[in-house]
């Protein structure tokens, strides 16, 4: 019985240490979540403004591309439009690229499994052959997952900061745009967990390349005229990659927010489970100790009675 009591006591001590660790991790994740939520809100204001400017500047290019798509003639103007604003040009889709965002480590609940399960279902539904798609992975969990299943992983990036910066994203965007221009894929979807609230996230797949979320009708009734130097083509060649960068950066910020929320929830759940286990073990320990004391008292009383 004494050995059993010691075993229970060791389990209680071990569980308390685990609970302290998970509680500390919960507090760290909560602090990161609060910080990135504030940055994400500020970034959304910037992103909306960039989108507005790009829509105004690219309105003429979008209209020319739309007219060119409806026409069967190959004019010099059409080739000029495509060369200046290639990121806006839609082309026949022979291969699709998927940029999948996961975490670099576990302890985030179902965060990674939700994304990867949805991705595999998406591939199964939309593609008949592995030659129809190519994978890009941000995060070690996703990269290892695709490698283990023999999928065509053309690019991987590990070690994104808990609070991402533009400098990190530039390398990713540059690679994605280069692969798009070189015909590695004809369209790119960014797939990640969208942050809804602390307890909820939802899988999202957004088309990033070619840029297709610019609506000319938004500027149709405005009379804004920009004075552009040196010329519109040069400005578009500079600002369109920056806009693509802002789109992907926004997706990474959103995914990281969902990751920290999932980590906070998972660690809170682990801490609660540890406390419940400690309570159960403490009750078990007290009962065992009470039984041991009762046995000792019974033995003493029995021995005393035998001496009479």
UniProtKB/Swiss-Prot annotation:
Gene3D superfamilies: 3.40.1380.10, ATP synthase, gamma subunit, helix hairpin domain (1.10.287.80). Keywords: ATP synthesis, Cell membrane, CF(1), Hydrogen ion transport, Ion transport, Membrane, Transport. GO terms for biological process: proton motive force-driven plasma membrane ATP synthesis. Pfam families: ATP-synt. It is found in: Cell membrane. InterPro entries: ATP_synth_F1_ATPase_gsu (IPR035968), ATP_synth_F1_gsu (IPR000131), ATP_synth_F1_gsu_CS (IPR023632). One of its GO terms (cellular component) is plasma membrane. It is a peripheral membrane protein. GO terms for molecular function: ATP binding; proton-transporting ATP synthase activity, rotational mechanism. Belongs to the ATPase gamma chain family. Produces ATP from ADP in the presence of a proton gradient across the membrane. The gamma chain is believed to be important in regulating ATPase activity and the flow of protons through the CF(0) complex. HAMAP family: ATP_synth_gamma_bact. F-type ATPases have 2 components, CF(1) - the catalytic core - and CF(0) - the membrane proton channel. CF(1) has five subunits: alpha(3), beta(3), gamma(1), delta(1), epsilon(1). CF(0) has three main subunits: a, b and c. This is ATP synthase gamma chain. It comes from Lacticaseibacillus paracasei (strain ATCC 334 / BCRC 17002 / CCUG 31169 / CIP 107868 / KCTC 3260 / NRRL B-441). The lineage of its organism: Bacteria, Bacillati, Bacillota, Bacilli, Lactobacillales.
């Amino acid at each position: 019985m004494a050995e059993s009591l010691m075993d229970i006591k060791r389990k209680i001590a071990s569980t308390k240490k685990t609970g302290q660790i998970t509680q500390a991790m919960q507090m760290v994740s909560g602090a990161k979540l609060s910080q990135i939520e504030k940055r994400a809100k500020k970034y959304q204001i910037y992103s909306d403004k960039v989108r507005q400017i790009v829509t105004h500047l690219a309105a003429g290019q979008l209209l020319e591309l739309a007219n060119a798509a409806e026409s069967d003639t190959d004019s010099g103007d059409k080739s000029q439009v495509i060369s200046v604003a290639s990121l806006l040009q839609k082309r026949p889709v022979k291969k699709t690229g998927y940029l999948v965002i996961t975490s670099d480590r576990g302890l985030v609940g179902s965060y990674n499994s939700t994304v990867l399960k949805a991705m595999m279902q998406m591939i199964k539904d939309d593609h008949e052959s592995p030659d129809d798609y190519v994978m890009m992975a941000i995060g070690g969990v996703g990269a290892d997952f695709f490698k283990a299943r023999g999928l065509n992983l053309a690019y991987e990036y590990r070690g994104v900061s808990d609070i991402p910066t533009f400098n990190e994203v530039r390398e990713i965007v540059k690679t994605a745009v280069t692969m798009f221009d070189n015909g590695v894929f004809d369209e790119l979807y960014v797939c990640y967990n969208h942050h809804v609230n602390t307890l909820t996230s939802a899988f999202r797949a957004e088309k990033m390349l070619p840029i297709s979320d610019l609506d000319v009708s938004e500027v149709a009734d405005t009379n804004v005229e920009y004075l552009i130097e040196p010329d519109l083509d040069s400005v578009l060649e500079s600002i369109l990659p920056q806009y693509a960068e802002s789109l992907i950066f926004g997706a990474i910020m959103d995914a990281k927010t969902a990751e920290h929320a999932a980590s906070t929830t998972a660690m809170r759940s682990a801490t609660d489970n540890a406390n419940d286990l400690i309570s159960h073990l403490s009750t078990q320990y007290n009962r065992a100790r009470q039984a041991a004391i009762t046995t000792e008292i019974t033995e003493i009383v029995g021995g005393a009675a035998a001496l009479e």
